[in-house]
Structure formats: C-alpha cells, structure tokens
Amino acid sequence: MKELKKIIEETYENKNKINLNNLDYEILQTIFRVIKLLNNGIIRISEKKDNTWITHEWLKKAVLLYIYIKENKFIEGSYTSYYDKVPLKYEKYNEKQFKKEKVRIVPPATIRYGAFINYNTIIMPSYINIGAYIDQGTMIDTWATIGSCAQIGKNVHISGGVGIGGVLEPLQNNPTIIEDNCFIGARSEIVEGVVIEKGCVISMGVFIGQSTKIYDRENGKIFYGRVPAHSVVVSGTLPSENRNYNLYAAIIVKKVDAKTLGKTEINQLLRNIK
C-alpha cells in the first residue's frame, strides 16, 4: 500500500505535466488498482481509528486523477443512455453476483464505479457518487444523494430526498460521515464534513453544515460539526445576541440509548417531544 500511495502522491504533484496520450503504464495501472480497491471496499477514504476519523488524502488524489485521465464514453442503460468518464458500478454484474453480495438495487438507482456497497443493503432510486462507502444493513431511500467520499455506517436509514454532502476538494477537508445505527429523516441535508455519531435520529428537514449551531437543550451546550451519539435532533431556531431576531439551529431535544432505540419506532421518538 505504501508503494501505491507513493506513486499516487508523486503523480498528483505533477498532474499538470501528465501526457494523456502517453501515460506511463505503471501510473495508469496504479490509479486503476486504487479505484478498484475502493470499489471493493478493501480500502476507504476515511476510517475510524482510536475513536477518531482519519481521512486519507492520497485516496482522494487517486479519485481526482482517475477522473482526470478518463475520457467520456457511451454507457448503455436498459431505458436510457449516458455519456460520462466514470462507469456505473454494476454495469457488468449478473444475477449471480447480486445474489452473492445480497444487495438490492432498484432502478433507476445510479451508483458510480469506485463506490462501495456492503452486504444486505437496499438502494432505492437514488444517486451514490465515487468514493462513497455504504456499510451493511443500510437503506438508501428514493431520491437520496450520497456525495463523493461520504461514509455511511451499518444499519443506517437514509430517508427519501436526503442529501449527504460529498467532498473531493479541498483535499484537506473531511467527508460527511453518518455512523452506525442512525436514522436521517426525509429531505434533510448533512454536508461539509459533519459527523453524525452513532445511534442518532435526525428528524425530517434538518439542515446541518459546519457553521450550523447544534444546541443541546438539556445542558445548553452548542456543538459545531458533529452531533453527539444517541441524539434526537429537530430543526429550530436560537435568538440572536441582541434578541432582535432568531437564526436557524439544529436542536437536540433528547438522548436515546441503543436499547430504547431498538424497541421504539422512530416516529414515536419524534412525536414524544415536550
């Protein structure tokens, strides 16, 4: 892996000098190999180590190089056609492969090559970009969009119309992360590298970016860039310093442990807010 990283780093530093008509074979195969490893979930853009999310910038560089060197090509679908640089993840799959991986892909879901979809997942008509990681037991509902490099954990429900932000550039920016056992309500937007920690319930229509105030009404704390584990969050407002107007905020209305979450319907959690 160190050798792959070295080649990618050196190539990216000299990307403006790349001759697309005479690209070095070793460089070409290295880029393709890295994207294949991402596609198969062997490596990932971001991973949690010692309770901290680490983003591998060199993998983002590999994705950018892949898009840079690829040419647009005709992509045939059963009901339409496409013209793009990045092929579709499942364009060469057969029934046996789908059954082996235990994934259900509902047309016209669009998943780009280089995104990883783990076992026992359901992908409704939605869009998943290159570099994204979708872990097992997760459902991506209709018209949801999962941006480039976004990380979605195990047993997550991404509801209809949800937007999970992607990031390739700037390279130092972290991807948006939804940890295990979370529920993201319909039409919500989680972007700009925000981390939704494990076991959270995000109500419908909640918008969270890096500058969004996330207010915990139980203790008065304000968070930025992350929602603490096991939080139930709704959209709301907080007063300005001069009290003349209110500004949008995400409000943590309660905490719910894993045992309670497993026994309680999501709608019940959101309705029982006082």
Swiss-Prot record:
Primary location class: cytoplasm
Record-level Gene Ontology MF annotations: 2,3,4,5-tetrahydropyridine-2,6-dicarboxylate N-succinyltransferase activity
Enzyme Commission designation: 2.3.1.117
Taxonomic source organism: Buchnera aphidicola subsp. Acyrthosiphon pisum (strain APS)
Pathway membership, UniProt: Amino-acid biosynthesis; L-lysine biosynthesis via DAP pathway; LL-2,6-diaminopimelate from (S)-tetrahydrodipicolinate (succinylase route): step 1/3
Name the UniProt record assigns to this protein: 2,3,4,5-tetrahydropyridine-2,6-dicarboxylate N-succinyltransferase
Gene name for this UniProt entry: dapD
Signal peptide positions (record): none
GO BP term, example: lysine biosynthetic process via diaminopimelate
GO cellular component, one term: cytoplasm
One Pfam family recorded for the sequence: Hexapep_2
Keyword Repeat: yes
Family from the record: Belongs to the transferase hexapeptide repeat family.
Membrane spanning stretches: none
